């Protein structure tokens, strides 16, 4: 049972997770209330995340690519949820326009899930290659770099809703940069998964190193608190600068 999460970490902030296609199905079936209650109770969640993984769905042989009614379903989900709702991308990032629509239907927080971290398009391409599905393998390979980079997505969304930076965060310095761009938090995946394969001590060592890196970046930036990084002077260069310029984002 997923309840072990709360049993092992009684004071942790626990986020339940469900896909937008499931939410849309629940809404159409008239079972939204029941399923929201079940999802919340399953892990005694402090918040519920709805992942918007359309890029992955396009490539999966079992993927659901119908998006009609998704915003209406998500709005209804937000209305009945007893806890805040996070809208979460899974590798393709969120645009400013989508961020505003999500805000308007009552979403509380954005998890940008930008390009630069795990590529589910590439993963699905490899799955298809192993199965001998050449068409989907080629589709996944062609879309492997699709999406908005994490840094750009953070900057695009941060003025609309509290924004979590996820996608390619590999160090405490990366987290500091994301916070300076306007994120309120940063999420890490792959580095911890690699350490977890080595054991608990490796995870703790990595987390301690991450903390030292973040604190060092704060000290060197004159930031007394994490939120002070948002006031740090930013210099944005290269492709990220060009993305922001073309999108008209400061």
Residue ranges, per PLM feature:
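Active-site entrance/lid segments in N-terminal catalytic domains of soluble metabolic enzymes
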Residues: 1-101, 105, 119, 124, ...
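Short, structured secondary-structure boundary patches
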Residues: 2-14, 70, 108-111, 130-136, ...
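Alpha-helical scaffold segments in soluble metabolic enzymes
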Residues: 4, 38, 76, 101, ...
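Generic secondary-structure signature for well-ordered alpha-helical cores
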Residues: 10, 41-44, 79-82, 104, ...
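Electropositive, surface-exposed helix/loop patches at the edges of structured domains
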Residues: 12-40, 146-166, 170, 221-239
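Generic structural signal for well-ordered, non-membrane alpha-helical segments
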Residues: 32, 67-70, 146, 150, ...
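Glycine-rich phosphate/ribose-binding loops and adjacent secondary-structure elements
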Residues: 68-198
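C-terminal extensions of enzymes
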Residues: 192-250
């Amino acid at each position: 049972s997923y309840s072990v999460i709360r049993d092992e970490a009684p004071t942790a902030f626990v986020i339940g997770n469900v896909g937008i296609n499931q939410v849309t199905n629940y809404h159409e079936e008239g079972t939204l209330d029941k399923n929201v209650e079940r999802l919340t109770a399953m892990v005694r969640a402090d918040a519920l995340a709805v992942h918007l993984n359309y890029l992955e769905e396009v490539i999966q042989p079992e993927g659901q690519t119908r998006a009609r009614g998704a915003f209406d379903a998500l709005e209804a989900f937000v209305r009945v949820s007893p806890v805040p709702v996070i809208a979460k991308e899974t590798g393709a990032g969120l645009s400013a326009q989508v961020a505003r629509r999500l805000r308007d239907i009552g979403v509380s927080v954005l998890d940008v899930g930008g390009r630069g971290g795990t590529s589910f398009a590439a993963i699905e391409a490899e799955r298809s290659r192993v199965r001998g599905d050449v068409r989907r393998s080629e589709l996944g390979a062609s879309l492997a770099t699709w999406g908005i980079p994490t840094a750009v997505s953070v900057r695009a969304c941060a003025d609309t809703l509290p924004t979590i930076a996820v996608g390619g965060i590999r160090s405490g310095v990366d987290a500091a940069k994301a916070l300076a761009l306007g994120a309120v938090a940063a999420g890490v995946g792959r580095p911890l998964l690699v350490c977890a394969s080595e054991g608990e001590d490796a995870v703790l060592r990595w987390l301690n190193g991450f903390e030292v890196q973040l604190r060092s970046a704060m000290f060197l930036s004159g930031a007394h608190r994490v939120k002070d990084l948002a006031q740090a002077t930013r210099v944005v260069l290269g492709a990220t600068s060009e993305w922001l310029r073309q999108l008209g984002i400061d």
